């Protein structure tokens, strides 16, 4: 399995913090934001990772992560021009992925809890075409929201609805196979001009989507309140001895 980290976008919800920098460089407790999704992929046993960059401070992102050796990873990079959506960014990785299953993690997602190695293996060896992790939140209107049937199965996803049909959202961890790239090519831009990940996931419904609930703690860090929440969660994990120290990176 290979990995993707999406680290583009304009991050207007974090202005003025992100006027002159990429949000994924902002600190969350004792390390840059982007270290968290990198650690999520490393915890699955993934070693080959592509970072999709865009927006400001691309050079600084590359300088920070370098070739990934200090994470035990082999990192490569691809540039996304403009805010064209998560599904569009995934489509840029077609040549990198080749014939392998892959996991895409959004660069502003912080997962603190058990690693995902077992879930990654279950997807890779299972029958599903795609997968994501569900998580219950208090403000689902900020996200894509899962609609469930009476048996608790996901039947649809809706992007940032005004009236959410549940409090369960697909967090920014997506398991996919190479066949996803053909589906990405069939998507049409949403009203905000993006290829939406919820539209891609809906192509696998009903019945072809792996969608377990995440049992750890999760937050995105795309707004000032959620950035603060992420730091608080990381501090709690650190004080409990559950947050490993950030990897040491040689400074030249």
Predicted features along the sequence, with ranges:
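Catalytic-core segments of class I nucleotidyltransferases/pyrophosphorylases
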Residues: 120, 124, 153-251
């Amino acid at each position: 399995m290979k990995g993707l980290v999406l680290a583009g976008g304009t991050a207007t919800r974090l202005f003025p913090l992100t006027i002159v920098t990429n949000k994924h460089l902002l600190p969350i407790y004792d390390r840059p934001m982007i270290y968290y999704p990198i650690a999520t992929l490393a915890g699955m046993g993934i070693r080959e990772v592509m970072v999709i960059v865009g927006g400001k401070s691309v050079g600084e992102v590359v300088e920070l992560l370098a070739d990934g050796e200090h994470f035990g990873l082999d990192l490569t990079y691809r540039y996304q021009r403009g805010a064209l959506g998560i599904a569009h960014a995934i489509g840029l990785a077609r040549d990198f992925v080749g014939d392998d299953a892959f996991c895409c993690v959004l660069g502003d997602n912080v997962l603190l809890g058990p690693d995902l190695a077992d879930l990654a293996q279950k997807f890779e060896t299972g029958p599903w075409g795609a997968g994501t992790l569900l998580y219950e939140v208090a403000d689902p209107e900020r996200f894509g929201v899962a609609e469930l049937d009476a048996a608790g199965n996901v039947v649809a996803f809706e992007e940032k609805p005004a009236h959410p049909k549940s409090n369960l959202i697909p967090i920014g961890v997506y398991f996919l196979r190479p066949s996803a790239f053909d589906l990405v090519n069939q998507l049409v831009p949403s009203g905000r001009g993006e290829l939406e990940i919820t539209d891609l996931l809906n192509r696998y419904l009903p019945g072809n989507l792996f969608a377990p609930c995440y049992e750890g703690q999760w937050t995105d860090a795309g707004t000032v309140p959620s950035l603060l929440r992420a730091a608080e969660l990381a501090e709690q994990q650190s004080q409990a001895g559950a947050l490993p120290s950030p990897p040491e990176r040689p400074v030249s």
